[in-house]
A protein has these predicted regions:
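Catalytic domains of riboflavin
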Residues: 1-198
Length: 198
């Protein structure tokens, strides 16, 4: 169950481990079940109830018990532009559809029990008349259609090398401010020297 950081805080979900050593860094929280209205928690209907209780806008920590049979995953702020994972893709797709920013994600398995990979998934989608997209497609869409850098302000600065424009930009994905010192007018048709300081 992919959830935002805000939703994990709302539900008081702690990370499953203090130090995540998995290769993909998937941010598992402690597992959950509904506090009321289920039996063992393992049936499809019990899991569905747990998911619906967890994503409810008014959900409280007391609506859930831990551990359980649903494994919430905390998405990175910034979505697939900060971490190209299934968790973030689920949240980003829900936001693009103007839905609650949460998503149930699953792995599709082949008949032989192995995990379906891209070619298998393309065949599965065709067989069942499903649309399919990749995380790379989503990253491309977001880079093309969403603004990730915002200009905050501009001022002039006098230095021993002359007058410069000092412009502040904010990276809205990582919430970092970057400063640009610009001298003179930059023409779109001409290349200019750029130096980056870290």
């Amino acid at each position: 169950l992919a959830l935002t950081n805000d939703k994990c805080e709302q539900l008081n979900l702690e990370m499953m481990v203090k130090e995540n050593t998995t290769s993909h860094g998937t941010a598992f929280t402690t597992s959950i079940d509904s506090a009321r209205g289920i039996t063992t928690g393992i049936s499809a209907s019990d899991r569905s109830k747990t998911i619906l209780d967890a994503v409810n806008k008014k959900a409280k920590p007391s609506d859930l018990v831990q551990p359980g049979h649903i494994f919430p995953l905390k998405a990175s702020e910034g979505g697939v532009l900060s971490r190209a994972g299934h968790t973030e893709a689920g949240i980003d797709l829900a936001k693009l559809a103007d839905l609650d920013p949460s998503a149930v994600i699953v792995e599709i398995m082949n008949e032989d029990g192995t995990m379906a990979r891209k070619e298998d998934l393309l065949n599965f989608a065709q067989k069942h008349s499903l649309k399919i997209g990749t995380i790379a497609d989503l990253i491309h869409y977001k880079n093309t259609n969403e603004k990730s850098v915002e200009r905050l302000g501009k001022t002039s600065v006098e230095t021993k090398f002359g007058k410069f424009d000092l412009i502040a930009y904010e990276d809205t994905i990582f919430n970092q401010t970057h400063l640009v010192l610009k001298k003179g007018k930059i023409e779109k048709q001409t290349s200019c020297l750029v130096r980056v300081q870290t």
